[in-house]
């Protein structure tokens, strides 16, 4: 439910795949990804890059989390593949590590903040991502750079 009639929020209970992603996300202006697996993140990343839709993505495993704001509407944004090239599901799985439950709420809050900044066209997050360590209460801003060999975005 939204306060304004002009805002439409969609969520999906089905698993995103290469076969259904166009149908699921074609009417989206922004994509907020909080999926729990690397394969889905890669599919969403490729779709958002291809369609030039901003992607706000969050992930957490154990006590640590990350928030990414990929500005694909800009021609100079790195992508998820630039950062995680060569890693697979086993490298980033929470099946064995689990998640510190309150951290998921914190990541969700940061996703909302980043989404609002995108809607308002505020550019404080460009080419950076946040790493959160909830065990030590540290939040670090990291620089994202385009991988010149990235199979998704290097042919801009």
Model-derived regions, located:
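Adenine nucleotide-associated cytosolic modules
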Residues: 4-156
